[in-house]
Amino acid sequence: MDPRSTLPSIDRLLRQAEARELIAHHGRDNVVGMLRRLLQDRRMAAGRGDRAAGERAAGEGVLDECAERLAAQARPSLRPVLNLTGTVNHTNLGRALLSRRAAEAAFRAMISATNLEYDLERGTRGDRDSHVEALICRLTGAEAATVVNNNAAAVMLMLNTLALGREVVVSRGELVEIGGAFRVPDVMARAGCRLHEVGTTNRTHLRDFANAVNEDTAAFMKVHASNYAIEGFTAEVPQADLAALARRHGIPLLIDLGSGSLLDLDAFGLPPEPTARQAIRDGADAVTFSGDKLLGGPQCGIIAGSRALVDRMRANPLKRALRVDKIILAALAETLQSHGDPERARAEIPTLRLLTRPQDEIRALAERLCPPVHAALSGLAEVRVVDCLSQIGSGAQPVDLLPSAGLGFAETGAVPVSRIAQAFRDLPLPVIGRVHKGEFLLDLRCLEDETPFLAQLDRLALAGPA
């Protein structure tokens, strides 16, 4: 008998209790559609002479397989993972983790109407920047501030507003490319201004900027080269000197800090990073930086500077296209509040807390985790406690690395390193590490709660070579 003729009808399957449970959870249309696809798959497999399919063609396990497929279909594509790569602000893994206060503020804004653009005192329309502007100005020393959806957008809005159709002078050594082949010259072109590059890759002097000024010059721009470093025979123009030259010529100095920082990181024992406050103090007329990198907040781009320039940017129609919503503003406001006190910021903001985590603490965690991980591997791979180096990530301080510790997995001949990495990614809560010098490495700097990691070790599916 042709096994395809024994497949049950959809009506018959739908009368079973298991199907009714699936319908209650997933909806009738989803269940019926999945059953049709599943039965069609079985018919086609049986028609090709697939023996296993023939044995299953009588309909055994159809509803179980349907339940599995529906569960997989319903699983969110965007999932939590454990970031054990050693890169604290990993762009591909979502960058900064929000503080609890920021996350709670975002949640409150999500589930309620808010005074996003409503002045409660006057009973009139308000400005959404009002919820964060005073905080940004207090932390940077700027006269005014506005927020858009990321730092590239902030740079684009700034240039489009202040230099449309005109030249912006930039040092050749600062024409950076950030992730995804996104280059400063491309942003400038899209903003509608013309790049006038000066100096050389490794050395640019104040006279290079002075000689570049002409009637078409709209601004000087300085871009912090946060994702690479040039060492050796180098020279760059100090911000204060460039600001003074800009003032003499009646043009603004614009600074893109990229990752940016509101705190002096060297006070925490971290590599120093330019701060927005110092840029404003040195005479910058407008400064842009990210909210989800060293700031440790939600993704956004912050522009701080003179009242006159920021007001012009707010009046640009692009501002509406690039504006942030109430969720971002709620999270950003709480993050900025935390930055009001450096020690509070380090305690509350995960990015700062993780970056300043002592190596001894991380090594102690590695020593606790090594025995249960070794047991879960069943001898298929070697695991040991290793010292390693973490990095800040998201283009910040690429040369300066942070002493850390973790678990290193070496091949024994039974299982290749690539399969070990895959096994950890396949866990219910995927664990993302990195391969370094032939070993799979889990840098434990970002693992503050080991319980979820340990709870799923029994699900670690390793096998020998296929």
Swiss-Prot record:
One of its GO terms (biological process) is selenocysteine incorporation. It catalyses: L-seryl-tRNA(Sec) + selenophosphate + H(+) = L-selenocysteinyl-tRNA(Sec) + phosphate. It is found in: Cytoplasm. One of its GO terms (cellular component) is cytoplasm. One of its GO terms (molecular function) is L-seryl-tRNA(Sec) selenium transferase activity. It is an enzyme of class 2 (transferase). The keyword Protein biosynthesis applies. Pathway: Aminoacyl-tRNA biosynthesis; selenocysteinyl-tRNA(Sec) biosynthesis; selenocysteinyl-tRNA(Sec) from L-seryl-tRNA(Sec) (bacterial route): step 1/1. InterPro entries: PyrdxlP-dep_Trfase, PyrdxlP-dep_Trfase_major, SelA-like, SelA_trans, SelA_trans_N_dom. The keyword Cytoplasm applies. Its cofactor is pyridoxal 5'-phosphate. Its EC number is 2.9.1.1. The modification N6-(pyridoxal phosphate)lysine is found at residue 293. Keywords: Cytoplasm, Protein biosynthesis, Pyridoxal phosphate, Selenium, Transferase. Belongs to the SelA family. Converts seryl-tRNA(Sec) to selenocysteinyl-tRNA(Sec) required for selenoprotein biosynthesis. This is L-seryl-tRNA(Sec) selenium transferase. It comes from Paracoccus denitrificans (strain Pd 1222).
